[in-house]
UniProtKB/Swiss-Prot annotation:
Gene: Zdhhc13
Name of the protein in its database record: Palmitoyltransferase ZDHHC13
Sequence ranges on the Lumenal membrane side: 313-320, 369-371, 492-518
The keyword Nucleotide-binding appears for this protein: no
Tissues where this protein is expressed: Expressed in most adult tissues, but at low levels in the liver, skin, and lung.
The UniProt record lists the keyword Glycoprotein: no
Transmembrane feature ranges: 292-312, 321-341, 348-368, 372-392, 471-491, 519-539
Subcellular locations according to the entry: Golgi apparatus membrane; Cytoplasmic vesicle membrane
Length: 622
């Protein structure tokens, strides 16, 4: 039963609605009238015993409403505005009153108001998901249309209530349902709502991209172009919308863009058309499949060319500088024209692999004669083999991507909604799944990752529950490889350069090693660069794992939160920090002669705390 709190309980009591960011597009004249009514604020009631039943319903004064109904008031009787009590209770999210009125014979789908809407329509306009759930559970029909011709899902889209959209579709509402004009929710979103959402959200439910409306024969892409909705156009093109379908006027989306003189959208459509046309050629398809390999070859050639120019037999550094600039210009053209945008994120990865390749070749060709048969030689070989193995394991191992079938997603959405948990803390609007504890959605991989640490651009993969331990050994082996090549460089200089640091001082020694072999100095600098960042990350990772029990994402999130808190937030006092030895045992999943036993947890399906349930709320906010 809802209490009669009178002040702030019903600030938004009328049957209007808010329009959250429609750009320049409105809905209708009636909508503005409803919106004006919604902004009215009822005066505070000091004595609720004398108020009428409409006002008592708006304020949620259950006892007063019950008293009047039991005295003979007909709950189906509309007021002067043709609005029923169920409408007023629905728009103000008075759950107990709705249950009471239904038990007293209220018509669940009674039409009323200026827009001839049902109580379900009113609840959706205001974004009251609990009320929507309650009305549907009592038999409300989501397919009914209001005076503007919109059904429930159309209204949820227009007012950008994503949880309600997800719930309606999961309960069986068709994502391709049309309004009186034959427009689907995707068409309305593309035309009425300027921005990427809810268009991107609807596309996750696999709506039809080729369906056309009754009047104009426009596809969703036509409507997005007509509205100048750049974000929606981008989403629809990414989803594979057709560029060739013509509307009733015989216009393609590109024709409409040219007619409206929207240069940005015209450029987007032309670029997409060119890319799709290129995919028809066998050579282009082959190049697309081999993009990463070609990028790796280009990177290896570029690194070799830089070293070759530096080692070129010329005393003119101006000439070498000009050659390096020309090389940089030429190599920048290949990724721009032949490598897709998605594969450009692998540039650091191919740079690392190319560096390791030339580090190995330098060791084998230049350093091998000075180290053959020594422990240094075998240590380097072991390090390079370990690096290749753990790089592959980090790359190939599933980091903990959370997966669910379409049916499982719908069941999860309904379950979360009906338990009051359908919010961004527990539900991923991109994957449409319930988020496990400590997970995060990676926008590069476009998937939720269990016990997410980071998306490492050096490996080109997410680091999570499945491959985090491989990542630690990857950093360790890379650090060892670079350490040995740095040591080998000093051995090479001591054997092949005519001077030493002790005899001639630093400046003369530096000049000599540059003149002795610019290539070795170049490889030394590459190794020093990779050694610096890999060692730093390794130390940072081991500190977080052993002393904090946190991932990189959790640590950064807690540090950000602490800036806005009055009291200092200790990173050590979290439910995941179980002490140095236990943290290491849990991370590497290994014990120590029975003294320490790891706690085996599958973070891909862990939704509640297992260590200290009282602290679950703290960690969910990380």
């Amino acid at each position: 039963m809802e209490g009669p709190g009178l002040g702030s309980q019903c600030r938004n009591h009328s049957h209007g609605s808010h329009v959250p960011g429609f750009g320049r597009h409105g809905i209708c004249v009636h909508e503005n009238k409803e919106l004006a009514k919604a902004k009215e604020i009822l005066p505070l009631i000091e004595d609720s015993s004398n108020c009428d039943i409409v006002k008592a319903t708006q304020y949620g004064i259950f006892e007063r409403c019950k008293e009047l109904v039991e005295a003979g008031y007909d709950v189906r009787q509309p007021d002067r505005e043709n609005v029923s009590l169920l409408h007023w209770a629905a728009i103000n999210n008075r759950l107990e009153l709705v249950k009471f009125y239904i038990s007293k014979g209220a018509v669940i789908d009674q039409l009323g108001g200026d827009l001839n809407s049902t109580p379900l329509h009113w609840a959706i306009r205001q974004g009251h998901l609990p009320m929507v759930i309650l009305l549907l559970q009592h038999g409300a029909d989501p397919t009914l249309i209001d005076g503007e011709g919109f059904s429930s899902i159309h209204l949820a889209v227009l007012f950008q209530h994503m949880p309600i959209i997800a719930y309606l579709i999961s309960k069986g509402q068709s994502v391709n349902m049309t309004d009186v004009n034959g427009q689907t929710p995707l068409m309305l979103s593309a035309y009425k709502v300027i921005g990427p959402e809810p268009t991107g959200f609807l596309l996750k439910f696999n709506p039809s991209l080729s369906v056309v409306d009754k009047t104009h024969q426009n596809t969703p892409l036509h409507w997005a172009v007509a509205a100048g909705n750049v974000s929606a156009v981008d989403k629809l093109l990414e989803a594979g919308s057709s560029l060739d379908i013509r509307n009733a006027k015989g216009e393609t989306p590109l024709d409409m863009a040219l007619q409206s003189k929207n240069q940005l959208i015209s450029h987007m459509l032309r670029t997409e058309a060119k890319m799709r046309a290129n995919k028809q050629f066998r050579l282009w398809r082959w190049l697309h499949k081999c993009e990463l390999f070609l990028l790796l070859i280009l990177s290896m050639i570029t690194l070799w060319a830089v070293g070759y120019i530096l080692d070129f037999n010329s005393d003119s550094w101006l000439l070498k500088g000009c050659l390096l600039v020309a090389l940089f210009f030429l190599t920048s053209l290949f990724p721009r024209f032949l490598v897709g945008y998605k594969n450009l994120v692998y540039l650091p990865t191919v740079f690392l692999l190319s560096s390791i390749f030339w580090i190995f070749m330098t060791w084998f060709i230049l350093f091998f004669p000075d180290t053959a048969g020594s422990p240094l030689y075998f240590a380097f070989i072991f390090s390079i083999m370990a690096f290749l193995y753990f790089f592959y394991k980090t790359w190939a191992t599933d980091p903990g991507f959370t997966k669910a079938s379409e049916e499982e997603r719908k069941v999860n959405i309904v379950t979360l909604a009906e338990t009051g948990s359908l919010d961004f803390r527990t539900f991923c609007t991109s994957c449409l799944i319930r988020k496990p504890l400590r997970s995060l959605h990676c926008h590069v991989c476009n998937s939720c990752v269990a016990r997410f640490d980071q998306h490492c651009f050096w490996t080109g993969r997410c680091i999570g529950f499945g491959n985090h331990h491989h990542y630690i050994f990857f950093l360790l082996s890379l650090s060892m490889v670079c350490d040995w090549i740095i040591y080998g460089s000093f051995v090479y200089w001591s054997n092949h350069c005519a001077t030493t640091f002790k005899e001639d001082g630093l400046w003369t020694y530096l000049n000599q090693i540059v003149a002795c072999s610019p290539w070795v100095l170049y490889i030394f600098m590459l190794a020093a660069f990779h050694f610096s960042w890999s060692t730093f990350l390794l130390i940072n990772q081991l500190f977080q794992i052993a002393f904090l029990g946190l991932t990189s994402h959790e640590r950064i999130s807690l540090l950000k939160q602490s800036r806005h808190m009055k009291q200092t937030l200790s990173l050590r006092k979290t439910p995941y920090n179980l002490g140095f030895t236990q943290n290491l045992a849990d991370f590497f999943q290994c014990g120590c002669f029975g003294l320490v036993k790891p706690c085996i947890i599958d973070w891909t399906s862990q939704y509640t705390m297992v260590f200290h349930p009282a602290k679950e709320k703290v960690l969910r906010s990380v």
